[in-house]
């Protein structure tokens, strides 16, 4: 990865959480400690961040997005990145798509930003997704407003729902906390309603979940598996789960 791409990647990571450590940069970019420090020095010299002990933070008065410990821990796992790459490969030039909130969908936004030669429109209710894509020259971007849920960085509620009802998408990409039997569930009913509307208004409906989400339960069931076109998951899905859930919809395993 050349220096220009490394610096772009570091800024993308900063946009998600507002702060970053040298260790996170080393792990994500597979570079040396010295290279990571030099890259941060270069970005600080350009006025794009402020160095801190062991890392850096964005030059912004805004409060960084609050995420749960689980979200922080799982943000850049290989499985989520692989799922995002597979989803990105299905998006065509000229598509209008919806991207919901969630760490796997943040990875999808990062994949889209790095892709060249495609012109698409993205509608999202996720602030982290918006912050990643808002300076892309090839993506027409629309952020749904509404009630803000800081824990996930998502806009929900009646305003978001009203705006979403008037929109149509070639593809919608959402996530879930739990998949069991024929049901898809999430913690927040308000987020579930938004994802339900987006799926209903899409020609192709995609659920992006890693294999740990199967045979789990959560509070609000917002969709049925047999209403989906495709589940995209990682290659660690068990043969039993693959057989069980394939009876409802198509399952694509990421490489």
From Swiss-Prot:
MF terms in GO: DNA binding; DNA-binding transcription factor activity
Domain of life: Bacteria
InterPro entries attached to this UniProt entry: Carb_Metab_HTH_regulators, DeoR-like_C, DeoR_HTH, NagB/RpiA_transferase-like, Tscrpt_reg_HTH_DeoR_CS, WH-like_DNA-bd_sf, WH_DNA-bd_sf
Keywords: DNA-binding, Lactose metabolism, Plasmid, Repressor, Transcription, Transcription regulation
SMART domains: DeoRC, HTH_DEOR
DNA-binding region location: 20-39
Gene Ontology annotations of biological process type: lactose metabolic process
Note: This gene was sequenced from pMG820, a laboratory-derived deletion of the naturally occurring plasmid pLP712.
UniProt-recorded name of the protein: Lactose phosphotransferase system repressor
Originating gene: lacR
């Amino acid at each position: 990865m050349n220096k220009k791409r490394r610096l772009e990647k570091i800024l993308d990571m900063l946009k998600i959480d507002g702060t970053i450590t040298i260790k996170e940069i080393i792990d994500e970019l597979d570079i040396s400690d010295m290279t990571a420090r030099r890259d941060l020095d270069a970005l600080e010299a350009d006025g794009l961040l402020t160095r801190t002990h062991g890392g850096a933070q964005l030059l912004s008065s805004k409060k960084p997005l609050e995420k749960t410990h689980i979200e922080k821990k799982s943000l850049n796992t290989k499985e989520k990145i692989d799922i995002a790459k597979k989803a990105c490969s299905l998006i065509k030039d000229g598509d209008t798509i919806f991207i919901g909130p969630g760490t796997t969908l943040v990875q999808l936004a990062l994949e889209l930003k790095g892709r060249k030669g495609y012109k698409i429109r993205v509608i999202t209710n996720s602030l982290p997704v918006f912050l990643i894509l808002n300076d892309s020259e090839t993506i027409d971007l629309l952020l749904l407003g509404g009630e803000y849920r800081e824990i996930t960085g998502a806009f929900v509620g009646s305003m978001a729902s009203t705006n979403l009802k008037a929109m149509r998408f070639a593809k919608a990409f959402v996530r879930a906390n739990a998949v069991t039997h024929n049901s898809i569930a999430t913690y927040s009913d308000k987020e579930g309603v938004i994802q339900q509307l987006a799926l209903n208004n899409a020609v192709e409906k995609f659920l992006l979940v890693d294999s740990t989400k199967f045979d789990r339960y959560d509070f609000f069931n917002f969709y049925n598996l047999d209403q989906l076109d495709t589940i995209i998951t990682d290659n660690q899905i068990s043969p039993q789960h693959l057989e069980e859930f394939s009876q409802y919809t198509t399952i694509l395993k990421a490489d």
